Amino acid sequence: MPVLLIVVDGLSDRPIDGKTPLSVARKPNLDRLAEMGINGIMDTIAPGIRPGSDTSHLALLGYDPYKYYSGRGPIEAAGVGIEIKPGDVAFRANFATVEGEGSIFDKTVVDRRAGRIEDTSELIKALREIELPVELLVERGTGHRAAVVFRGEGLSDRVSDTDPKAVGKKVKRCVPLADDAKAKKTAEIVNEFMQKAHEVLENHPLNRERAEKGLLKANALLLRGAGEMPHVPSFKDKTGLRLCVIAATALIKGVGRVVGADVITPEGATGNKNTNLEAKVKAAINALESYDVVLLHIKATDELGHDGDFEGKKAFIEKLDEKIAPLLDLDFSKTCLILTADHSTPIKVKDHTADPVPVVIVHEDVRRDEVSSFSEFEAYKGGLCRIRGMDLLNIALDLLNIAKKFGA
Amino acid sequence: MPVLLIVVDGLSDRPIDGKTPLSVARKPNLDRLAEMGINGIMDTIAPGIRPGSDTSHLALLGYDPYKYYSGRGPIEAAGVGIEIKPGDVAFRANFATVEGEGSIFDKTVVDRRAGRIEDTSELIKALREIELPVELLVERGTGHRAAVVFRGEGLSDRVSDTDPKAVGKKVKRCVPLADDAKAKKTAEIVNEFMQKAHEVLENHPLNRERAEKGLLKANALLLRGAGEMPHVPSFKDKTGLRLCVIAATALIKGVGRVVGADVITPEGATGNKNTNLEAKVKAAINALESYDVVLLHIKATDELGHDGDFEGKKAFIEKLDEKIAPLLDLDFSKTCLILTADHSTPIKVKDHTADPVPVVIVHEDVRRDEVSSFSEFEAYKGGLCRIRGMDLLNIALDLLNIAKKFGA
């Protein structure tokens, strides 16, 4: 009796001339799900609170983001594959090009992406050899991106970025943002790492090769967004259920890993509009065999919203509609299917907003309503009225009679 | 990109023979706003919790009243113009007539309004000269009303009223309501004030004049509703936004001052049904030029509800509808207009109830719904479904893209 939770990132919108990509898209399968299920609108965090994809996914999995979210760093680090632990301090990082004399902090950023370097695997290996008073974990992300984690006693995330976030500026020294020993110690370690990383990178054969080819050297790692990994109970411990997250996006994979889920990225799943939707849908159907809760994340709608691409978002929704057709054949006497979004990414705003998302829950036992179209203009008329993200999974588990009674 | 929040006090009702003043009033402009906007119902505090106008206005401004409300005293004191500070203990007070021998506590209340005395300004001046172990602040309210504030170390609001709340009863001695030194100290100071105030008033020339004219002496000040002013972050500090409150009612002006708003009472604004609505609407339109959030409070609907005057409430709603016509010409690509109430004051109950209030949010970017009439019987069919007072401003700030993202 599994739950399939399909989260279409940034799916919903604000109207432009009364229309949204979702409302005008041809989407017979999504509409059929609306017709079969019980519909409503949902504030993934709370009304008027603009969700990140990380905070909203935590909430959708039943984790209060106000309690369990401490910034993007730890989630990105988990997303790229670092086995992050409570107390670790994680940073997002990018390989950059710096120039000038003296220490790393005397040098000027020439390019924040090191000439859009693609393969940093050799550089990452070299960085891992750096010796620090605490344990160091480094992992590459896509392109010039990376994650850096410091592990040891008495560290704190109350420290500043070393990334000046602009070219032509000097690399910033990490400073404590709190008047305590932990923050001071962490800042010192970060600065030691910054200098040692620069030395390792500057002298790395790959960078000599790049220089010879006229490419920019990836000779510094700039850090930002320190976050301390909180104590997050695993989904299994919390609910007794096996969770699988199917995603290609590091941030969502990170949320999955932080809560102890198995994370699957099917072949060809990319997190953009050319992703292999068939493979993702197939992976989801397979996962329903061996997991209690399967979260299927679809990213491109959000990107197309950030791009302000109305037609592109509409077209991708139509493609998605086509590709999810096999899900309509699931046995809804056993499976509970939920279709929703993590937040709105309106074309007009090009960023996340708090406009509530449509949600439909399909299962044989739901109280079906009169909604027969999946859109921002119909969902609120449904039998769920307006719910919150933190409540969604509880509603599904209740439907499946997995929920426990509170009281007698 | 400002928010205009129009709060029509006690606007909504319970039906009598299926009708409410709002549902039967002729109100083309209010209905037009409903048609242009997204509608819903709102529990200003929580479902089933009967709001005061003070607690509900705190909630509508985003302040949790369970955290920031400590009784009517401090808010009334702020409302009449006392610059109240955290830790101050404030009382509502009324000038009264007492008779008998001995101390103030041996005397009997003859009239709780001192013959409906109008001008107490000379008496207030004299009271301010009283010497106490702590600082004393006194300010007149309307008619026989006043506010009294004690300021100093170690005071508490856990003390009883001195107002016996009935004629023919003796003035009550203030007693501590908690077994601690602060409450004991405060009660002693209150009792010292009661006696000294009585002496000052009894011998005041104005009271000798009143006696000569056969009027009742205003020879005592009765205190009730002790409240300690809590630490309330200013609206500006909390949100970064400039708030203006347009109101004539002391309680609402007090809420405004407590949160650090600029408070405007336009010429002719009275807080009753003869108030100058044109002036209030004009002041609101002007305020939108220089503030981020403008709260326009309209009081008379509540009074007419307390009076159980169905026809009077209906007639005032029709007048209000006419006078707000200029607001329909606001530029809703910039301004977000919210029309709602702080609570219901049903004709049949003659007091506040928790029946949810209708709310409409008008802005170019809202997801318009099919509601085209502003009433208790239509609002719930709208796209907002059912929200809470604390969420309202967040929803508006999200619409105006002022909201910050929580997460990544």
From Swiss-Prot, chains A, B:
Optimum pH is 7.1. Signal peptide: none annotated. Keywords: Glycolysis, Isomerase. InterPro entries: Alkaline_phosphatase_core_sf, ApgAM_prokaryotes, Metalloenzyme, Pglycerate_mutase_ApgM. The keyword Zinc-finger does not apply. Pfam families: Metalloenzyme, PhosphMutase. It catalyses: (2R)-2-phosphoglycerate = (2R)-3-phosphoglycerate. CDD domains: iPGM_like (cd16011). Its cofactor is Mn(2+). Pathway: Carbohydrate degradation; glycolysis; pyruvate from D-glyceraldehyde 3-phosphate: step 3/5. GO terms for molecular function: metal ion binding; phosphoglycerate mutase activity. Its EC number is 5.4.2.12. Optimum temperature is 60 degrees Celsius. Does not lose activity after 120 minutes at 60 degrees Celsius at pH7 with 50 uM of manganese chloride and 5 mM of magnesium chloride. GO terms for biological process: glycolytic process. The keyword Isomerase applies. NCBIfam families: apgM (TIGR00306), PRK04024.1 (NF003104). Catalyzes the interconversion of 2-phosphoglycerate and 3-phosphoglycerate. HAMAP family: ApgM_A (MF_01402_A). Monomer. Belongs to the BPG-independent phosphoglycerate mutase family. A-PGAM subfamily. This is 2,3-bisphosphoglycerate-independent phosphoglycerate mutase 1. It comes from Archaeoglobus fulgidus (strain ATCC 49558 / DSM 4304 / JCM 9628 / NBRC 100126 / VC-16).
